[in-house]
């Protein structure tokens, strides 16, 4: 069972990967972190919002396709419903919102 400090370190790292990955991808996506929330805004004004839910030790993602909850297990964040890996879903959602493939290493 992870403690709150470990949870925040893992989330901070995940959000940094997303911000750096978006920069690396060259896609026209603005990212802004305010408190516990990372907002990705696209050219068409649509948004993806990612925030941390400390009491549950979950990452939540909201986009026009719906809401997703992720738990950390065995070194990765996975969707509590589908099991999809967090970064794969973020890239897919970014690609849908941007209207182009958004990918990073």
Curated annotation (Swiss-Prot):
One of its GO terms (molecular function) is ferrous iron binding. It comes from the Bacteria. Keywords: Iron, Metal-binding. Pfam families: Frataxin_Cyay (PF01491). GO terms for cellular component: cytosol. GO terms for biological process: iron-sulfur cluster assembly. Belongs to the frataxin family. HAMAP family: CyaY. PANTHER family: FRATAXIN, FRATAXIN, MITOCHONDRIAL. NCBIfam families: FeS_CyaY (TIGR03421). Involved in iron-sulfur (Fe-S) cluster assembly. May act as a regulator of Fe-S biogenesis. This is Iron-sulfur cluster assembly protein CyaY. It comes from Photobacterium profundum (strain SS9). The gene is cyaY.
């Amino acid at each position: 069972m992870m403690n709150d400090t470990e949870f925040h370190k893992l989330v901070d790292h995940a959000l940094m990967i997303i911000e750096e990955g978006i920069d690396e991808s060259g896609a026209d996506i603005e990212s802004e972190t305010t408190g516990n929330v990372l907002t990705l805004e696209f050219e068409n004004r649509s948004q993806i919002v990612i925030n941390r839910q400390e009491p549950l030790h979950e990452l939540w993602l909201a986009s026009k396709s719906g809401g997703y909850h992720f738990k950390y297990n065995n070194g990765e964040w996975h969707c509590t419903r589908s099991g999809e890996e967090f970064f794969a879903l973020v890239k897919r959602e970014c690609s849908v919102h941007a209207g182009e493939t958004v990918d990073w290493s």
